[in-house]
């Protein structure tokens, strides 16, 4: 039962389904469920180790960079997100509801604060120190995705903590090694360019 609850939380946060961005070819990713594991291992023949592996990002989870950036925005907003859209500019006209509807997963808001603090500390004194940018507080997390028989993928996800400078960023560099390397360096340059342009 706990596994299905966890899976439902992920679905509410935009994983396992298309987010609905206005770009062709969007992937839905994949979040396994009990039915999937019963098919792979046999009815109720999979163990808690399978659930633990999935919970820490190992195993069969597939997420798109856009879904990860959306998760970052959800953490920055402390529990809600907009469906991502591609826009050139937003003017003073009233936007249709599809652009302004907030999606709020049924997750205790206190958890977001704890995660945000962990991401802040990763930048202050952890693997993301390179993401620091002047007096603008940045929160982030590096990741290293293992690839069988090849070099790991390098990940970084982060966001600006300032409400007047909203930015969520994600970078995956395939077969580039640790997350604190290429992905963090590229993300840092993107964030600096955006934040300089906005201040």
Residue ranges: model-predicted function:
Residues 96-97, 101, 184-199:
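Short, gly/Ser/Thr-rich active-site loops of penicillin-recognizing serine hydrolases
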């Amino acid at each position: 039962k706990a596994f299905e609850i966890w899976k439902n939380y992920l679905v509410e946060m935009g994983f396992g389904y298309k987010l609905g961005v206005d770009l062709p070819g969007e992937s839905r990713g994949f979040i396994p469920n009990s039915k999937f594991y019963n098919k792979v291992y046999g009815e109720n023949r999979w163990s808690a180790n399978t659930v633990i592996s999935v919970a820490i990002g190992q195993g069969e989870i597939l997420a798109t960079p856009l879904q990860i950036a959306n998760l970052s925005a959800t953490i920055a907003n402390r529990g809600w997100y907009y469906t991502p859209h591609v826009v050139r500019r937003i003017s003073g006209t009233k936007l249709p509801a599809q652009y302004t509807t907030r999606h709020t997963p049924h997750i205790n808001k206190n958890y977001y604060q704890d995660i945000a603090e962990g991401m802040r500390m990763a930048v202050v004194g952890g693997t993301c120190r390179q993401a620091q940018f002047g007096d603008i507080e940045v929160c982030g997390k590096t990741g290293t995705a293992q690839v069988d028989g090849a070099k790991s993928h390098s990940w970084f996800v982060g966001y600006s903590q300032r409400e007047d400078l909203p930015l969520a960023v994600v970078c995956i560099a395939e077969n580039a090694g640790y997350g604190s390397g290429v992905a963090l360096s590229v993300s840092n340059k993107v964030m600096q360019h955006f934040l300089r342009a906005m201040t």
